[in-house]
Amino acid sequence: MSVCTEIDYKLYTELKKIAGNSLFLFNENGDFTEVVLNSSFKFLVPIGFFSSIDIPLKKPIEYKNNNNNIEHSKNIILPNLYPFQKHVVSEVLLSMEKKNKHKRPTYITLHLACGFGKTITSCYLLSLHKKKAVICLPNKMLINQWKRAIESINMDHIVSVDGVSNLLKEMVKKTADILIIVSRHLLNEEFCKKIYLNYDIFILDESHMYNLMNNSAVTKFLTYYPPKVCYFLTATPRKVNRIYCNDIINVSNSLELKKYIKIVEFFFETYSSDTIKQMVKKLNTNYNKYHMYTEKILAEDVPRNELILDTIIYDFNKMLINRLIIVTKLRKHMMFFYDRLSEKFGLDVVYLGDAKNKNISDIVKKIKSIDRFIFISTTNYSGTGLDVPTLDSLVICSAVMNSMQIEQILGRICRSSVSKTRTVIVFPNTSIKEIKHMVGFFTQKIITLAIEKLNFKKIEKKGKKKELALCKAFNLQTH
């Protein structure tokens, strides 16, 4: 159980530093409500908030007494780690030692870059803990990645793919050291009670996917059924989530990668169509609140689409890019590039990353073993959890993304593989005058984050007119 207490000025100040404008917690009556200064209510402050030694303890934290050790610890196979991953393990062990000394909960956020190897590093930690653990995922796309990792360390496990009711029935017949679940399982209170009693470690993968200032299943679980040990895994942590896990370990990835961002600039003549004219009318309305119509119009930009195709075809034929992922915002845009590129290169080279395809995991598995391919998907599918370490190139066809989404997308090509060169290609110009400045603004945001935060080097290619020969001339690459 969380720490039930009145929120005095000092505690309120510490919580507000993290929460920002609005602070929401469960009160003693079970209501999820905003916390105001001098409230007469007592509130449940998550024990993970006190994982930081800088936060004074209101009262000793009570833990469940039972220990849930794994049954066959002698059979565990420790995974091989890179030196920078071993450094994370050392930092975690040092943090645990301090927490034990000060009687603080072992709640740690592993803030590690995309491509760092958070999954295998976490498996190493599980091997050291030798405690039963629950691995909680935001969606099923990540299941296979975790299943392979757990199998590699030889831990007994259950993967839940058929819902929490079926899992509860299976757990009556069989116990497992590791449960791999999706977060919606935590809506079931019977299941929450069961894992609270029978499992000691909880890993929340892709923790940035959850806003714990909302009354969600994960928020409620961490408040009412807090595990003994908890890890949040993310490349892009949400600040507000520190209220539930208030100690962060951040270690940089020292992989020797040569990373380039290629900016293909073109000065198009103005283009429009009846479809575009109709959508332009909605640009300054609530319909475009999340820039959906900006992206819809961009998808209809024929000259820009042709430039993107020319760039991809030229660079792929010249073997400047080899294992490529193309990302769009809209499914329609994705299908456009898939149809054109599959016609050009064939279905043995071009693959569709369609979340609606039940066999998508088989497609992802297949391209891992292919030397050269083009994989086309949406930002929604490929942003988090796409596990293709061999990717070396990324073409971004969309424009509007927040910083978290940008870093997740760029992270798809920052993993360790045989190739040491990584290339991102962006297109900051559009032939549609009504969205010209907006597209330029958001593309510059991508460029700035790639260079300043992820250490990409800039390559600029410029042109004046949309002419094929000129287009190809400016697509020459110098690395």
Curated annotation (Swiss-Prot):
Domain Helicase ATP-binding per the UniProt entry, residue ranges: 99-255
Domain Helicase C-terminal stretches: 308-469
Keyword Transit peptide annotated: no
Keywords tagged on the record: ATP-binding, DNA-binding, Helicase, Hydrolase, Late protein, Nucleotide-binding, Transcription, Virion
GO BP annotations listed: transcription initiation at RNA polymerase II promoter
Enzyme Commission no: 3.6.4.-
Record motif DESH box, residues: 205-208
GO terms assigned for molecular function: 3'-5' DNA helicase activity; ATP binding; DNA binding; hydrolase activity
Pfam family, one: Helicase_C
PROSITE patterns, per the entry: HELICASE_ATP_BIND_1, HELICASE_CTER
Record-listed ATP binding positions: 112-119
GO cellular component, one term: transcription preinitiation complex
Localisation per UniProt entry: Virion
InterPro entries given in the database record: ATP-dep_DNA_Helicase, Helicase/UvrB_N, Helicase_ATP-bd, Helicase_C-like, P-loop_NTPase
Assembly and oligomerization: Interacts with G2. Might be part of a transcription complex composed at least of G2, A18, and H5.
Function, in words: DNA helicase which seems to act as a postreplicative transcription termination factor. Involved in ATP-dependent release of nascent RNA. Forms a stable complex with single-stranded DNA, and to a lesser extent RNA.
Family: Belongs to the helicase family. Poxviruses subfamily.
Protein name as annotated: Transcript termination protein A18
Organism the protein comes from: Yaba-like disease virus
